[in-house]
From Swiss-Prot:
It catalyses: L-glutamate = D-glutamate. The active site is at residues 75, 176. It comes from Thermus thermophilus (strain ATCC BAA-163 / DSM 7039 / HB27). Belongs to the aspartate/glutamate racemases family. It is an enzyme of class 5 (isomerase). One of its GO terms (biological process) is peptidoglycan biosynthetic process. It comes from the Bacteria. Keywords: Cell shape, Cell wall biogenesis/degradation, Isomerase, Peptidoglycan synthesis. One of its GO terms (molecular function) is glutamate racemase activity. This is Glutamate racemase.
Length: 257
């Protein structure tokens, strides 16, 4: 029997998954969280899917050893590479971010997708929604990880990637959890296009599932421990610039995974 008071594990290649963590905390204020950012190996998007799959299994195994009651793969690349196997083989509920965003896009006639090279090439999204256009945007994740989401260079890069988007595009799936931090630049290039991200929808799915399984924490204090494979203080500085209050952060060496 899983312990309702156990934490929820959330992981991403870096700070992108903080968008999902924020939505989870808003819906589940009593839950305790372990947020794992694989900052020593970010970005995932240009790496082979087999390598990303290995990373996802390493992190999921580590989180299980910390006693989590559920795992949220708050990374589109890792969700595309590993989610079906993780969900089938792990002993706790596992949630990804691909299907929730794809479901949100079904109400639009002409839908586009931007994501990492690995996510776009994986074909994960077309399993759930018809796409009129898709584009890999490999520089977007480094822009966010370097703290440049509101720098003029972000707008220049967005124009470079999005200039060939169809003029009649109705919705664009932000197929990477880093990309919501770039909504200002993306929206400036594609005014009038609905920008869809999966954070809120994923959080709702997690909340429904935990309630159905009797796993909601009745008396938690809503704390989050941040775990990173890179420099903890560099992570803290970046996360706090993104609006995340980091009360506790600890480095996890790759040898511990």
């Amino acid at each position: 029997m899983k312990d309702p008071k156990a934490p929820i594990g959330v992981f991403d290649s870096g700070v992108g998954g903080l968008t999902v963590l924020k939505a989870l905390r808003r819906l589940l204020p009593r839950e305790e969280f372990l947020y794992f950012g694989d900052t020593a190996r970010v970005p995932y998007g240009g790496k082979p899917l087999a390598m990303v799959r290995r990373f996802a299994w390493e992190i999921a195994g580590f989180l299980l050893r910390q006693g989590v009651k559920a795992i949220v793969v708050a990374c589109n690349t890792a969700s595309s590479a590993a989610l079906p196997d993780l969900a089938e083989d792990l002993s706790v509920p596992v949630f990804g971010v691909v299907e929730p965003a794809a479901r949100a896009a079904r109400g639009f006639r002409k839908v586009g997708l931007i994501g990492t090279q690995a996510t776009v090439e994986s074909g994960a999204y077309p399993r759930y929604v018809d796409l009129a256009w898709a584009k890999a945007c490999p520089l977007f994740v480094p822009l966010v990880e370097e703290g440049l989401w509101d720098d003029p260079v972000a707008l220049l890069v967005a124009r470079h990637y999005l200039e060939d988007a169809p003029k009649d595009l109705e919705a664009l799936i932000l197929g990477c959890t880093h990309y919501p931090f770039l909504k200002g630049a993306i929206g400036a290039v594609l005014p009038g296009v609905a920008l869809l991200d999966s954070a809120e929808l994923t959080a709702r799915e997690v909340a429904r599932a935990l309630e159905a399984e009797g796993l909601l924490n009745p008396e938690g204090r809503g704390r989050t421990l941040h775990l990173v494979t890179g420099d903890p203080e560099a992570y803290r500085a970046l996360a706090e610039r993104l609006g995340e209050r980091v009360e506790a952060v600890r480095r996890v060496s790759l040898e511990e995974l």
